[in-house]
C-alpha cells in the first residue's frame, strides 16, 4: 500500500499541479486510511471492499470527524482507488457505491465597512512594521488574496504603474487582480522606503518581510491580524480569510458581477463564489428583521 500511495501522491502533484497544502491534506487522509486497514489486518489493496470502507467511515465518525472532513476523506480515497485501478495496481474499485455525505456550508464571518476601516487604521504608520502591516491589510482587503498567496508574493509580482498584482493561486494557477489608488499609494511607499529598511543584509525578493529581513510566515500574518483585531475591538473571529470574505461580499453588495468576483478570487467553481451572495442576502434579512415594524 505504501508504494501505491506514494505513486498516487506523485501523480496528483505532477499531473494535476496541486498545491503543497492540498497534497498534505491528501497525505493525511491516506495515512488515516492506511492505519485503519493495518489495524484490521488488511494487507493488500484487493482485499478492500465496500463493507470495509463503510466500517472505516463509521470509525472516523465515532472519532468525531465532521461531515465536511468525511466528505473530503471519501473524495481522497475514491480518487486513490480510481488511480490504483487505472494503473493496474488493483483489480477493482471498492468506492463505486460509496456515497459522499452532504454537509451544510457555513456562512463565513464578514466585517462591516466601519470594522474594516477600524482594522486598517490600527497599525502605527510611524514604525516600519506598522507601515508594513497597514500595507498588507490594505492589499488583503483590496484583492481578496489567500494568506498563502500573499506570503508567496515577490516584489516583481506587483505592477504599480499598470495597477495590478500577479497572484499564483491553488495549483499554481496565475491570475491578475487590479489594484485601487489607496493600496497603490501604500505599496509605493512600502516598496520604495520601508521594505529596504526591513531587508537588512538579506537578498530575498519576498514582498512582505519580518523584522529579520525574511519572508513573513503564514502564522506570523495570522498573529498580526488577530492582534490588530483585538486593538480595533472587533468582536468577530478574525483571520486573513475574513478579509477575503469581506472583499467578496462588499463587491457583490455593491453590484459587482459574480463572474468578475470569481476571477479575482481565483475560484475554479462559481458555486464557491455564489456562497457570498447568500451572505449578502442574510445581511439583508437581518436588517429587515431589525428595522421593519412588521418583521
Curated annotation (Swiss-Prot):
InterPro entries in the cross-refs: CB, DNA_brk_join_enz, Integrase-like_cat_sf, Integrase_catalytic, Integrase_recombinase_N, Integrase_SAM-like_N, Recomb_XerD, Tyrosine_recombinase_XerC/XerD
Record keyword Iron present: no
Annotated GO biological process: cell division; chromosome segregation; DNA transposition
Active site: residue positions: 146, 170, 241, 244, 267, 276 (o-(3'-phospho-dna)-tyrosine intermediate)
Domain of life, per lineage: Bacteria
SUPFAM superfamilies linked: DNA breaking-rejoining enzymes (SSF56349)
UniProt keyword RNA-binding, yes or no: no
Start and end residues of each Tyr recombinase domain: 106-289
Subcellular location: Cytoplasm
Keyword list, A-Z: Cell cycle, Cell division, Chromosome partition, Cytoplasm, DNA integration, DNA recombination, DNA-binding
Xref: Gene3D superfamilies: 1.10.150.130, Intergrase catalytic core
Domain Core-binding (CB) span(s) in chain numbering: 1-85
Family under the similarity heading: Belongs to the 'phage' integrase family. XerD subfamily.
Role description: Site-specific tyrosine recombinase, which acts by catalyzing the cutting and rejoining of the recombining DNA molecules. The XerC-XerD complex is essential to convert dimers of the bacterial chromosome into monomers to permit their segregation at cell division. It also contributes to the segregational stability of plasmids.
NCBIfam families associated with the record: PRK00283.1, recomb_XerA_Arch, recomb_XerD
Assembly information from the UniProt record: Forms a cyclic heterotetrameric complex composed of two molecules of XerC and two molecules of XerD.
Name of the protein this chain belongs to: Tyrosine recombinase XerD
Amino acid at each position: 500500500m505504501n508504494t501505491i500511495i506514494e505513486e498516487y501522491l506523485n501523480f496528483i502533484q505532477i499531473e494535476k499541479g496541486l498545491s503543497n497544502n492540498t497534497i498534505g491534506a491528501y497525505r493525511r487522509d491516506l495515512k488515516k486510511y492506511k492505519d485503519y486497514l493495518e489495524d484490521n489486518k488488511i494487507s493488500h489493496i484487493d482485499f478492500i471492499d465496500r463493507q470495509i470502507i463503510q466500517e472505516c467511515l463509521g470509525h472516523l465518525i465515532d472519532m468525531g470527524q465532521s461531515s465536511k472532513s468525511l466528505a473530503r476523506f471519501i473524495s481522497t480515497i475514491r480518487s486513490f482507488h480510481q488511480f490504483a485501478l487505472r494503473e493496474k495496481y488493483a483489480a477493482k474499485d471498492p468506492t463505486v457505491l460509496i456515497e459522499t455525505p452532504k454537509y451544510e456550508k457555513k456562512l463565513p464571518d464578514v466585517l462591516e465597512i466601519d470594522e474594516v476601516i477600524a482594522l486598517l487604521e490600527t497599525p502605527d504608520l510611524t514604525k516600519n512594521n506598522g507601515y508594513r502591516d497597514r500595507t498588507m491589510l490594505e492589499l488583503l482587503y483590496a484583492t481578496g488574496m489567500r494568506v498563502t498567496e500573499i506570503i508567496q508574493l515577490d516584489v516583481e509580482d506587483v505592477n504599480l504603474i499598470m495597477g495590478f498584482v500577479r497572484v499564483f493561486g491553488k495549483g499554481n494557477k496565475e491570475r491578475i487582480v487590479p489594484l485601487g489608488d489607496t493600496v497603490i499609494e501604500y505599496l509605493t511607499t512600502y516598496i520604495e522606503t520601508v521594505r529596504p529598511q526591513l531587508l537588512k543584509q538579506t537578498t530575498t525578493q519576498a514582498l512582505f518581510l519580518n523584522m529579520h529581513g525574511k519572508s513573513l510566515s503564514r502564522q506570523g500574518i495570522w498573529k498580526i491580524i488577530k492582534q490588530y483585531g483585538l486593538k480595533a475591538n472587533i468582536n468577530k473571529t478574525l483571520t486573513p480569510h475574513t478579509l477575503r470574505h469581506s472583499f467578496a461580499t462588499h463587491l457583490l453588495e455593491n453590484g459587482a458581477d459574480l463572474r468578475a468576483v470569481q476571477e479575482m478570487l481565483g475560484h475554479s467553481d462559481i458555486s464557491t463564489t455564489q456562497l457570498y451572495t447568500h451572505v449578502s442576502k442574510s445581511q439583508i434579512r437581518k436588517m429587515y428583521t431589525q428595522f421593519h415594524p412588521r418583521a
